[in-house]
Swiss-Prot record:
Name of protein: Putative extracellular sulfatase Sulf-1 homolog
Catalytic residues, chain numbering: 79
Record: residues binding Ca(2+): 43-44, 79, 308-309
Protein source organism: Caenorhabditis elegans
Matching CDD domains: G6S (cd16147)
Record-listed E.C. numbers: 3.1.6.-
Gene3D superfamilies tied to this protein: Alkaline Phosphatase, subunit A
Co-factor binding details: Binds 1 Ca(2+) ion per subunit.
């Protein structure tokens, strides 16, 4: 009996060991399979304006030897909120860093979210972690965030010279000497030093490194050896460049006019400087991968390259900046390479900054925390491989993401907002309102381009004063008779809107120091505005200041502009309530290429407090659109299949049922938590047969169509 009991006990022990040993072996195998992981993050780098075309080394290393995600997006086009998303894997409404000020390294961030960053998770998984470069905009350098073994972060925002860093707990100050102070090179040098030292001393331990470059963020100081490059480069002039004003878009763009020659010169020079700063990043990437090759670590290292958001330079008349829910601000470079990642391949599926944290943890063999909202990119790679082999066991990839900026209050029902907006922007209503103005009811006097008249059907119609139009207008085209009246109404309303904005001083760009006298000069010509611009092509009507330039030679205009004026808009006056404005002067840039003094200075308002929105960005085999709701109750919809530059707000062409479904999906994504966000990131409704075609024909509500070529 005792013998049988012993045998039974031995059997139990053997059975328990049998259960335990595979677990331990699996665990060891999991740790042994951990790879090094590097995240390379740039600051304000676009993809829409062509910046990657000027980084050949990075393109070869990351694109040709890795995978490009052509639909790489950020879920918010603002620095600190986007970076907080990258570090946590959370949407903005879950980490509550809504702006570059509010909670950017604030109390909630430090007490809650910073303690659950990818650095903490990777460190706990046995990685040696390092962070170098820009952290968050309001980081004051007084502490080292949890999770980082090696820490070299700039205090506050990006700079290239004259900055302070927290280097492993010690504050370091840097000057203006290129060889030892240039921040981009310093980030590269210290990153290489970290890798080299780590591999030589701790080769058995995987490392995780975030390299956060300042380029091409302002003040856009290029390294001296690159300051001569890219003269006359204008790749930033996309289809939406200087397409303004836009009465069918949100409040700010309704009040942003076309750029004049000085503004255009500014965007050209700023684009050039941005590309120049990226050359140091390009060299740094090459040096980084050369070192990994020398240390025999390429086979064992994953790398991700992306930016915190995009940028605009003249798009829709906006001189510079981010913050907008358009492709140029939300779409970013997005590349990945490493073991098992296909080479020289492009994926079109939507990926975002919310996916970076889950991806880095997946590489480390760490299960994704339930709180994270994104998904590992390795799952997408596996899914593509499975599809290629006709295996569909994995969950399908998303086709929709949330784009958000700021806190959204409770709004009225979408149907009520839509009807109100549709009524406001209806052509007939707008035509009636405009034609009631006395100046359009008078007979065709010299210089007048349009006349309104009332028909027997009690409707306003417009009459073109043909004797006052130039026969030399190259922009005028022969049109079909059936479309003649409707096209004339389009042209008239566009012209009237632009004139109304200019007469009302509502243009939020280009206020020069001598704006007082420019305004007086314009006042003398307002009654004759038609004389100044008889050839009124809707896409070529200029900013009001441009009208003065048309009457003055360039030499005289520059001389006139430099002369001090009474009542001028001084730099300290460059502000408007609820607006974010800046003054550009010749002293703004300290390094070549410099702003020509003869072009003077100007004020520009690039953002406003009511530019708060939540959007759906959807892209799949049948649909490709952006749907947005603004805090002002404004609604917009852009169909990329027919309008890739987002020139037309086509919301009035949507069926009300589709609109309500889009609004419902947006509402659910706005409040999603944890893994719910992935559930609401699939547009199931768009697969309904009756909703395959999102649009219906309501031509009278398509307010501003671009000229057909």
């Amino acid at each position: 009996m005792i013998s049988n009991l012993r045998i039974s006990n031995y059997f139990i022990i053997f059975y328990v060991l049998f259960l335990i040993i595979p677990i331990k072996v699996t665990s060891i195998h999991f740790v042994d399979s951990q790879h090094n992981v590097i995240l390379i993050l740039t600051d304000d780098q676009d993809i829409e304006l062509g910046s990657m075309d000027f980084m050949p080394k990075t393109s070869q290393i990351m694109k040709e030897r890795g995978t490009e995600f052509t639909s790489g997006y950020v879920t918010t086009p603002i620095c600190c909120p986007s970076r907080s998303t990258i570090l946590t894997g959370l949407y903005v409404h879950n980490h509550h860093v809504h702006t570059n000020n509010q909670n950017c390294t604030g109390v909630e961030w430090r007490k809650v979210h910073e303690k659950k960053s990818i650095g903490v998770y990777l460190q706990e998984a046995g990685y040696r972690t390092a962070y170098l470069g820009k952290y968050l905009n309001e980081y004051d350098g007084s502490y080292i965030p949890p999770g980082w073994d090696e820490w070299h972060a700039i205090v506050k925002n990006s700079k290239f010279y004259n900055y302070t860093m927290n280097s492993n707990g010690e504050r370091e100050k840097f000057g203006s000497e290129y060889e030892k102070d240039y921040f981009t090179d310093l980030v590269t040098n210290r990153s290489l030093k970290f890798i080299d030292k780590h591999i030589k001393i701790r080769a058995w331990q995987p490392f995780a490194l975030i390299i956060s470059y300042p380029a091409p963020h302002g003040p856009e100081d290029p390294a001296p050896q690159f300051a001569h490059m890219f003269e006359n480069e204008i790749s930033h002039r996309t289809g939406s460049w200087n397409f303004a004003p836009n009465p069918d878009k949100q409040w700010l763009l309704q009040r942003t006019g076309k750029m004049n020659d000085v503004h255009i010169s500014f965007t050209d020079l700023l684009h050039r400087r941005r590309l120049q700063t990226l050359q140091s990043v390009d060299e740094g990437i090459e040096r980084l991968f050369n070192l990994l090759r020398e240390l025999n670590q390429l086979w064992n290292t994953y790398a991700i390259y992306t930016s915190d958001h995009g940028y605009h330079l003249g798009q829709f008349g906006l001189l510079k900046g981010k913050n907008m829910p358009y492709e140029f601000d939300i779409r970013v470079p997005f590349f990945m390479r490493g073991p098992g990642i296909p080479r020289n391949v492009t994926f079109n599926e939507i990926v975002t900054n919310v996916d970076i944290a889950p991806t880095m943890l997946h590489i480390a063999g760490v299960p994704k925390p339930a709180r994270m909202n994104g998904r590992s990119l390795l799952e997408l790679v596996a899914l593509k491989k499975k599809k290629k082999k006709h295996m569909t066991a994995l969950k399908p990839w998303r086709d929709t993401i949330l784009i958000e900026r700021g806190k959204m209050p409770k709004l009225k029902k979408i149907r009520d907002r839509y009807i109100k907006q549709k009524k406001k922007f209806n052509k007939e209503n707008r035509l009636s309102k405009e034609c009631k103005r006395r100046k359009w009811q008078r007979d065709c006097v010299h210089g007048q381009l349009w006349k309104c008249y009332y028909t027997v059907e009690d409707r306003w119609r417009i009459y073109k004063c043909r004797d006052n139009w130039s026969d030399q207008c190259s922009c005028r085209k022969k049109r079909e008779i059936s479309n003649y009246d409707d096209d004339d109404i389009d042209e008239f309303l566009t012209y009237a809107d632009r004139e109304n904005f200019s007469e009302g001083h509502e243009w939020y760009q280009g206020e020069f120091e001598d704006s007082g006298e420019v305004g007086e000069e314009l006042d003398g010509h307002r009654s004759k505005r038609g004389i100044l611009s008889k050839c009124s092509c809707s896409r070529n009507v200029s900013h009001p200041i441009k009208l003065l330039e048309q009457k003055m030679s360039k030499k005289h205009y520059l001389k006139y502009k430099k002369k001090p004026q009474n009542g001028s808009l001084k730099p300290k006056d460059c502000s408007l309530p609820q607006m974010n404005c800046f003054t550009h002067t010749a002293s703004h840039w300290k390094t070549p290429p410099l702003w020509p003094e003869e072009l003077g200075e100007f004020c520009f308002c690039q953002n406003c407090n009511n530019n708060t929105y939540w959007c759906l960005r959807t892209k799949n085999e049948t649909h490709n659109f952006l749907y947005c709701e603004f805090v002002t109750e404004f609604i917009s919809f852009y169909d990329f299949n027919t309008d890739p530059d987002q020139l037309i707000n086509a919301v009035y062409s949507l069926d009300i049922g589709v609109l309500e479904q889009l609004s419902e999906q947006l509402r659910n994504l706005r409040k999603c938590k944890n893994r719910q966000c992935e559930i609401w990131s699939t547009s199931q409704m768009l697969r309904s047969p009756k909703l395959v075609d999102l649009r219906v024909n309501e031509k009278s509500f398509l307010t501003y169509q671009p000229e057909k070529t």
